[in-house]
């Protein structure tokens, strides 16, 4: 199951009446097993799963497995509404293909004020003023406080490897707007369909969307997509092959 999320394998450690058993018992010392037992409050017949991989892969695969087990073992109270605010998101994440840090949310999100001095020297430990509201595992709201200071915005661009010239070339309208005074601002976007889905007690968002697209992205109500006239393609400068 975890291979879908990029994990290569899933190891386990189970506490039985005779002691620890499982695929990782041979590679852990008795002291390490006891440390895990204390730290995780492991009791008899409890089982611990491990993924040894890059941090993001391990977190994604084990998080998905945890949710799956919750459903499969009927451990989730479907009549409860559990809200959770998620804050202090990482400001950046490392892109191994490009060998540089990129914005984890987007480059216009404000960093936490106490992390501003670390943007260039320690980007891995900078956190943002982004926030999500989660209900029963579904993201309902997502937003952030935005950058309203030009010097700070330039510093964030520099942290993701963008020169000042590139920033002005790609976002000239945005960078120029700072010169006229930008007030502190932020906001959220709400996932209304997800909220409706939870209230309706369904796991399929198409059940609550007024005119849902099919799996092939066609709109049955509007009968779209429809054939395009060659004159329209010519006007738009689009050539199909």
Describe each region flagged by the PLM:
Residues 1-241:
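Structured aminoacyl-transfer and RNA-binding surfaces used for tRNA recognition/handling
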């Amino acid at each position: 199951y975890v291979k879908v999320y990029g994990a290569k394998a899933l190891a386990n450690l189970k506490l039985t009446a005779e002691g620890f058993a499982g695929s990782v018992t041979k590679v852990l010392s008795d002291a390490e097993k006891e440390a895990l037992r204390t730290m995780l409050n492991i009791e008899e017949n409890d089982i611990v799963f491990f993924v040894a991989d890059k941090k993001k892969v391990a977190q994604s695969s084990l998080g998905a497995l945890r949710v799956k087990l919750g459903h499969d073992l009927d451990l989730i109270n479907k009549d409860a509404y559990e809200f959770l605010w998620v804050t202090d998101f990482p400001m950046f994440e490392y892109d191994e293909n490009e060998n540089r840090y990129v914005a984890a949310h987007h480059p216009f999100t404000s960093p936490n004020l106490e992390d501003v001095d670390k943007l260039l020297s320690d980007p891995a430990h900078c956190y943002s003023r982004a926030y999500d509201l989660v209900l029963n595992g579904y993201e309902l709201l997502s937003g952030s406080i935005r950058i309203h200071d030009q010097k700070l915005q330039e510093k964030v661009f520099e942290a993701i490897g963008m020169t000042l010239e590139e920033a002005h070339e790609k976002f000239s309208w945005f960078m120029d707007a700072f010169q006229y005074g930008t007030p502190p601002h932020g906001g959220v976007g709400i996932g209304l369909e997800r909220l409706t889905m939870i209230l309706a007690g369904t796991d399929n968002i198409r059940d609550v969307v007024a005119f849902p697209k099919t799996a092939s992205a066609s709109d049955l109500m509007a009968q779209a997509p429809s054939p395009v006239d060659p004159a329209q393609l010519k006007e738009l400068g689009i050539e199909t092959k």
